[in-house]
Regions:
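Active-site-proximal cap/loop segments of hydrolase catalytic domains
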Residues: 1-182
């Protein structure tokens, strides 16, 4: 009851990002490919199709009901980025740089804001991967890291090197940092 974790991807990733700004019930959370700033994402396109992203905020998934100029407060209130200071839950974020559905700068914005405020957070990016990692080695890596993350926060297991020290960009794919620190 006191060791609850939560995970979601895409729309679910947004829901996790939003949820942790409203409650501290979760001991750890993973947010995959989240939209965290509906105002900046509104003006974007889906990179793989070139379609406008505006419709999804106005009438489909987000159901805001109109444009940011008609309902600025709704866009503001539904964008987790503006409530980062209220997040107390450790967060693992996965957002890939070839994501054609959700602009990956949304994940970067989220991560950089969390780190700026000293919040425990990690960003995983699988270079060249789209909305969800399709290469088996990336899926395996993601599952290992997600399990280590939740095991650390929910079961009190030792922290792995990648969470404690990070992995320098030049060592990506060479040194995984899976080793647990005693």
């Amino acid at each position: 009851e006191s060791n609850i974790g939560v995970q979601g991807h895409s729309w679910g990733g947004y829901q996790i990002a939003y949820l942790v700004t409203k409650t501290d019930i979760f001991k750890a959370a993973e947010s995959g490919a989240p939209v965290v700033n509906m105002i900046s994402a509104y003006g974007g396109i889906r990179w793989d199709t070139g379609l406008s992203r505006q419709f999804q905020y106005e009438h489909t998934q987000s159901r805001i009901g109109g444009t940011p100029w008609e309902y600025p407060q709704r866009y503001f209130e539904n964008s987790p980025i503006y409530n980062i200071d209220k997040i107390n839950t450790p967060l693992l974020i996965m957002h890939n740089d070839a994501d054609g559905h959700v602009p990956w700068y949304q994940g970067i914005e989220f991560f950089m804001s969390l780190r700026r405020l000293g919040k425990p957070s990690w960003l995983l990016n699988y270079n060249g991967a789209r909305h969800w990692p399709l290469k088996i080695q990336n899926r395996k890596d993601f599952n290992i890291r997600m399990q280590q993350f939740f095991d650390h926060y929910l079961k009190g297991e030792a922290e792995p090197v990648w969470m404690d020290r990070g992995i320098p960009a030049i060592e990506k794919g060479i040194n995984q940092g899976y080793e647990l620190i005693d």
